[in-house]
């Protein structure tokens, strides 16, 4: 009976048309074209959403190369778009590595308090980078983007990023529970350094606000109406193996995943004889495409071509992004 089911549409149209989505993660094994796919998805979303943000969490920060434009840790408008923004963050960075834009509007007392608290945070392993992540998410949430696309690092780092909201929630909760014990020590420490304006209550309120944002993000990440994950792979054994492992881990974490992109595929033209290597690669890819069809019959599987030229710059990404919406046709003439 299952064999009679129609395969799901081979595109990302289902994601682009799902207005409730707030967070879309794009990830997979290194070297499969995640950045090209995430950038292309962001471009398509920008056509139908009011404002779109793409965030690179990969230390390699390839979205600057993809759009041929330098991005920073603060959302920057992408050239050629009115409603598409990009930023690059290091999820392993600490609070002191965040730019001043993250702390605009805070009084000097809170800035001093943050510096003192930083010393204490350093004594709690993992809390520093967790709070840095919390600051980033608070900034992103405050800007009210319609949807946020994450261009993630290779699989291991991605799973850690997905779990970060839970880590932050626990870490901030621990800090707040220690508040009564920390407050006198913080005041005394500040006094010894001649910092009379340290306001523990203000800093505590900031932690409360941060915890509230992260708790909300954590809930949204596990809501399939608001969050989903797109797996990118190529038709080879190791990539397929990594994809299956990623899907299993995402399922354990309660993260929705029902889209797979198979990138860098050969589409042989029957009117021309293929070289021996191309014919061999084509057979290998066909074998793994059959396996993908069997394993993921309830997934949207989008097939993207291996191109002669690299996809770089806004115009190239715009053209390539059409393949996410309409299955690639090797006979169709490329758009100029």
From Swiss-Prot:
Gene Ontology molecular function terms on file: ATP binding; ATP hydrolysis activity; metal ion binding
Primary site of residence: cytoplasm
Presence of the UniProt keyword Hydrolase in the record: yes
One GO cellular component term: GET complex
The protein's Enzyme Commission number: 3.6.-.-
Principal EC category: hydrolase
SUPFAM superfamilies referenced in this protein's UniProt entry, alphabetically: P-loop containing nucleoside triphosphate hydrolases (SSF52540)
Subcellular location, record wording: Cytoplasm; Endoplasmic reticulum
Positions that bind ATP: 29-36, 236, 263
Keywords assigned: ATP-binding, Cytoplasm, Endoplasmic reticulum, Hydrolase, Metal-binding, Nucleotide-binding, Transport, Zinc
Catalytic site: 58
Highest taxon listed in the record's lineage: Eukaryota
Protein function: ATPase required for the post-translational delivery of tail-anchored (TA) proteins to the endoplasmic reticulum. Recognizes and selectively binds the transmembrane domain of TA proteins in the cytosol. This complex then targets to the endoplasmic reticulum by membrane-bound receptors, where the tail-anchored protein is released for insertion. This process is regulated by ATP binding and hydrolysis. ATP binding drives the homodimer towards the closed dimer state, facilitating recognition of newly synthesized TA membrane proteins. ATP hydrolysis is required for insertion.
NCBIfam families tied to this protein: GET3_arsA_TRC40
HAMAP family named among the record's database cross-references: Asna1_Get3 (MF_03112)
Quaternary structure, from the entry: Homodimer.
Similarity comment text for this entry: Belongs to the arsA ATPase family.
Name under which the protein is recorded: ATPase ASNA1 homolog
